[in-house]
A protein has these predicted regions:
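N-terminal hydrophobic/helix-forming segments and targeting peptides
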Residues: 4-371
């Protein structure tokens, strides 16, 4: 990299987390008969009923004491160890007329038919990590749908997988970051955590994490604080989080004109309430980059009588203000335990984001930009 007298950052931001269930500190619940259940709580806004009757694994981190040290160990069970069983229709005749699961009752995962007792959970985790149960001092463990991803359809045009939101954007952003060549400016790949629960953590988009990292990069390049602020003013962030494709059975849930389809191209999202960070300037810049890279784009806006969510760009800009655009891949069944997107959109995103990273943008305030 050859940094000039002045420089700027070109960033993508995605998030690594998805809605699921987190294991509570006291993890076991007795069930009917000899059964043992897992004591969990919801992480994020999931579609509850999609978690029924799927064998589930455990993944996360465990804090283990080794003498005078506390070490973090990653854990991902290689087999399914829990399931959330449905109540048979014979015992719930109205289930197909509208069923709202109670997370404290209906969504408790079954982990044993009688072989395990209260207190055995940590022993099982310790065995997975080859440590003693008393060495475990803390854990952040979550239920995981281990169902394999599938490319399917008569033309192999669909991809279905857990965690498509937002690992599709994390993957395509990372591939673009690794494959792009830009010798003059600072390319940054940022993947936040905890977006699904509000981003208000030390590793979330509302934290100082990104701003702190950019400031340290600025210092390592030999620039002063004034140069840092000038760099931010000339920088651009592409906030990457998936978008709702028009549902084949529920077109009425989308705006009549600003709706997007699978395999129709990368989505540029806008909202008058600024929950998406796109404005005319950032849209124009990203649109021009996509046009030059021969990548189709789609415009998304929420239906005017429906509230939409927010994502990363407007939140991270609270700590490190810069030009930003919200984009994503179109998908169906967002926040289901198994989601569906378009195969071609993955390729479109890699091509568009690679072109973004490789473009030496020269931003002159909010008035013009040299591509």
């Amino acid at each position: 990299m050859c940094i000039r007298d002045s420089y700027h950052f070109q960033l993508t931001a995605s998030h690594s987390d998805s809605p699921t269930f987190k294991v509570k500190a006291v993890p076991e619940l007795d069930g009917a008969g000899e059964t043992l259940r897992l004591n969990t709580e919801a992480y994020g806004g999931m579609i509850d009923y999609t978690w029924f009757d799927r064998p589930l694994a455990l993944a996360g981190r465990v804090l283990v004491r080794e003498g005078d040290r506390i070490e973090s160990r990653l854990l991902a069970t290689e087999r399914e160890v829990a399931i959330i069983p449905s109540l048979a229709i014979h015992m719930n005749r109205g289930v197909n007329e509208g069923f709202a699961p109670n997370r404290a009752v209906d969504l408790c995962p079954l982990i044993s038919a009688g072989d395990l007792k209260q207190g055995d959970f940590d022993a099982l985790i310790a065995d997975e990590l080859d440590v003693e149960p008393e060495q475990i001092l803390g854990r952040d463990l979550f239920l995981v749908n281990r169902q394999d991803a599938r490319i399917w359809g008569w033309a192999d045009e669909f991809i279905s997988t857990p965690k498509l939101d937002d690992l599709a954007c994390a993957y395509t952003s990372l591939q673009a970051f690794l494959g792009a060549e830009n010798a003059h400016d600072v390319s940054v790949f940022c993947c936040f955590d905890n977006e699904e629960v509000g981003s208000e953590t030390k590793q979330g988009a509302m934290s100082t994490f990104l701003a702190d990292a950019l400031r340290r990069i600025n210092g390592s390049l030999g620039f002063d604080d004034e140069s840092y602020h000038r760099a931010l003013a000339a920088s651009m962030l592409v906030s990457c989080d998936n978008a709702h494709a028009v549902h084949p059975n529920h077109a009425e849930k989308c705006d009549a004109r600003n709706q997007v389809v699978l395999n129709g191209g990368i989505v540029i999202k806008e909202a008058a309430n600024q929950h998406y960070c796109t404005d005319a300037f950032s849209r124009a810049v990203f649109q021009a980059i996509c046009d030059d890279a021969d990548v189709p784009t789609q415009a998304f806006a929420n239906k005017s009588d429906m509230a939409g969510g927010s994502t990363l760009g407007n939140l991270s800009n609270m700590q490190a203000s810069m030009h930003a655009v919200d984009v994503g891949l179109p998908q169906l069944a967002m926040h289901s335990s198994y989601e569906t997107g378009g195969v071609r959109d993955v390729m479109y995103a890699i091509r568009a984001l690679t072109a973004f990273y490789e473009r030496n943008l020269t931003i002159n305030g909010a008035e013009s930009v040299e591509l």
